[in-house]
Amino acid sequence: MEKNSKLGKKLLATGNGRCNIMNAGEPVYFGERDFAHQVLSYCPPDSVRAFLEGLGLVLRTGEGGRMYPAGNRGDMVLDALTTPLLGSGVQVLLDTQAEKLEQVAEGWRVTASNGESYTAPSLILAGGSCAAPKLGGTDSMYQLLTPLGFELARPLPALCALETQRKPLQGLSGLRLLARLTLLAQGEPADAAQGEMLFGDTGVSGVCAMQLARAAAQALDKGQEVVLSVDVTPTLGLRDTAMERKPPEKPGQMAETARQWLLKRAGFLPDNRLLQGALPKPLADRLQGPSIEETAHHLADWRLQVTGVRGFDHAQVAAGGISTRGINAQTMESALPGLYLCGELLDVDGDTGGHNLMFALATGILAGESAAG
């Protein structure tokens, strides 16, 4: 039963159309992360990969462990998943949404938007989250499950751009650079990431900024003050340039390294042009201070007030969802016999890079095998 007019609409949008299907590196999950790790102990990444290769897919591994179909096309993944489905005679109901769930003597009854009711001994729910409504994201599954006693962790946008005060960004729109970003909530480091960031008119994006949206949304939802500390020393070659999530550290601890770098440049450049040729001019002008000490501080800890995140329309996933309490991580069966939950519907969200699809696949494999008996 598919709400959209075709299968795999969200799948085709992942990885900029290339379908970043899974990740070969260390799993990175949030929310009820212990549950995610339990799931991956029963259906590990190697098993997910074997499942996909058993469908004929050839996978390749890129930067950061990201795995794609060798042809770099999402429709290859969709074809691999749907061909055996349709070939087995499975009836697919498109443009059809579940509107009511009932536990009955025969198992579960679903009343659908087409006016029909369907009854089966087992029911698998993989309705996703409210992220990306243009691709079919909705909160309808939450509304169906909470009356049945399931707990809901408030959904918030994740993996989206950060909105900041606009004045400090004037003249920087479109600028890309390598940076280490640290998110501060009430003055304390909450999360950090390193990689390419992109300046916009209303905030910052890029992978490393998007990775911090979850923590930013949760802190703002609690009414906390949220600040982004931008460290541009990776662009200057003063830090490693690996594009990956980093553990939080004390903001500005690279200031002394930056100061020593500036002192060397002071031997051949005027004090008011120490960043000339090192950073794009609009940013160099913004970070250049009246003294070497102040410029060094700006390079290692330039602060932007975070005012929000872009919202579900622009979010790749949602933080929050249905609690995994009572769900068997080996089978994905809930405390209500015959009812299985999987994927992004649950209070588990992963980092960018294929972690979310890998969790969806692993839970789907476990649920399908268990429900089929």
Regions found by a protein language model. Name each.
Residues L12-L78:
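A conserved beta-strand/loop capping segment in the N-terminal third of enzymes
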